[in-house]
Amino acid sequence: MTIVDAHHHPYRWVLFTGICGVYFAFGVVAMSIPPLVGEIRADLGLSRGSMGLALGAWQVVYIVSAPVGGRLIDRLGIHHGILLGAIVVTASGLVRAAATGFGSFWLAIALFGVGGPLVSAGAPKAVGLWFGAERERRLAIGIYSTMPAIGGMATLVFSNSVLMPLTGSWRATVVIETGVMVVAMGVWLVVSGRAPEPPMAVVPPRGSVAIGRKGLLASSEFRLVLLLGLGVMFIGHGLGGWMPEVLREHSGFSAMAAANWVALGGLVGVVASLVVPRRTERHRLPSAMAMILVAVAVGVAAVVVLPTVLDPISVAMAGLRSAMMPLVLVALMESDAVEPSNTGVAYGLWFAVAEIGGVTGPLVLGRVADTSAGFGGALLLVALVCVLMLVPVRRMRRFTDRDLRR
């Protein structure tokens, strides 16, 4: 096989379809709770703070399990690793539907954090192994990173408009949504089981040594990308977990209307995630990130200060936050210290640090919303975080501009 053939293996898009299916279902299960927050709080007797703690449960586990999951992906391979992750995510969805109180509800959501890292680290490793051409690789990153958002968007739309009226039960709704992962597992089992050997090398070239965890952490560029991941997750999980409730309680929308407007924001994020990474050259990554952060800050602040009738526009602007994830993932994959043989470890470390933001986002916003500041104060806090993230984004220029000068 020539180098060109290796970069364009005919099976790469078939395998990629299976990855996208699992990642889509990942988003469905992850987002199964936020549209139903009101019903679940009433049924289980949870305060906003307790619900925020539960929403961040799987991110707490991610902090510990992500490095382990990354190493498992490197050792088990993407076929078995992603399959194992999908099984655990399915179990999480079923167990959360059977919760009877805060403790069991928290544990059920936390279980998601055990299987999730295998999926989230397996997807970029597969892209690194099967997509050698830079533009195709960036396109693949943009596509698969939108799958959780699309899955979450579908959950937002169908939970209150179709499934809740059909079943009359938040528990049955969660079970049905978990069934999407069962279907995705079946597809992945078939397409990955028939896959040939990946065209890209999974071991370092002869005479070189794979960069391990210590080597990755010694890279200042890698550490900067870790910091960006923390901020992106704080914003993404914080707004993703609470935005439907913000529009219901702060702006006065119905549950269905709130879910639909949040889904619109998700659609904006999906389009941006597909377009921006592919068209953004490495030296322009900081500029693209800065523009998105400013837009998100303006959007969430506008929900607080502008008339409610303009909220859909503000929510759409805030939806651009989804495009930050693929941009940061591109920066991670193109870091000097990251290579195919250590992709799992690198992404495991990244998710471990990033999910600190994923944990604190829903928790902090929930706590702030429980105070006299309400959801307005919580949204202004998100805007402040966006502004603060402009500092590490600016520092990233020294790495992207360095590559431009080579």
Label each residue range with its predicted role:
Residues 109-147:
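Cytoplasmic helix-loop-helix junction between adjacent transmembrane helices
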Residues 102, 143-193:
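Helix-loop-helix hairpin linking two adjacent transmembrane segments in secondary transporters
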Residues 340-372:
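A late C-terminal transmembrane helix in Major Facilitator Superfamily
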Residues 31, 59-67, 153, 266-274, ...:
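Residue-level signature of mid-helix packing/kink "hotspots" within the transmembrane helices
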Residues 33-34, 221-263, 270-273:
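Extracytoplasmic gate region of multi-pass secondary transporters
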Residues 284-331:
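C-terminal transmembrane helical hairpin of 12-TM major facilitator-type secondary transporters
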Residues 64-100:
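Conserved MFS/SLC helix-loop-helix module at the cytosolic interface between two early adjacent transmembrane helices
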Residues 2-9, 195-225:
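Juxtamembrane intracellular "pre-TM" segments in multi-pass secondary transporters
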